[in-house]
Amino acid sequence: MTRVRRGYIARRRRTKIRLFASTFRGAHSRLTRTITQQKMRALVSAHRDRGRKKRDFRRLWITRINAVIRGSGVSYSYSRLIHDLYKRQLLLNRKILAQIAISNRNCFYMISNQIIKSGECEEFNGII
């Protein structure tokens, strides 16, 4: 029986996997079985962390806004600020508010003071 030469399909598949894992350390970038295992693990982690990244950034923005609000000296909290923003129908999301709070505090203080003033006027109008 004559010798049969194998095709290139399996080799092409393995080189594709090796290119994916070329930055991994140790046997994870050299041995085919461990490469496939690490590739699956990396893709699972990437899928999980795409959702986690959104949550982490939202937490960071909320923390930054709250820190600047509480540092202003006025007894005002993040939750009251967001509540008043929604009441006034101001379309500023948490990402933009956090960027304003970090880069331009005076502008952020002006926004929050304007909201506080308009909130106090409405409360007095409701009492009288």
Swiss-Prot record:
Name of the protein this chain belongs to: Large ribosomal subunit protein bL20c
A biological process from GO: ribosomal large subunit assembly
HAMAP family recorded: Ribosomal_bL20
Function text: Binds directly to 23S ribosomal RNA and is necessary for the in vitro assembly process of the 50S ribosomal subunit. It is not involved in the protein synthesizing functions of that subunit.
GO molecular function annotation: rRNA binding; structural constituent of ribosome
Organism: Piper cenocladum (Ant piper)
PANTHER family: 39S RIBOSOMAL PROTEIN L20
PROSITE patterns, per database record: RIBOSOMAL_L20 (PS00937)
Keyword tags: Chloroplast, Plastid, Ribonucleoprotein, Ribosomal protein, RNA-binding, rRNA-binding
GO-annotated cellular components: chloroplast; ribonucleoprotein complex; ribosome
Family, as annotated: Belongs to the bacterial ribosomal protein bL20 family.
Residue ranges of the TM segments: none
Domain of life: Eukaryota
Signal peptide bounds: none
Intracellular or extracellular location(s): Plastid, Chloroplast
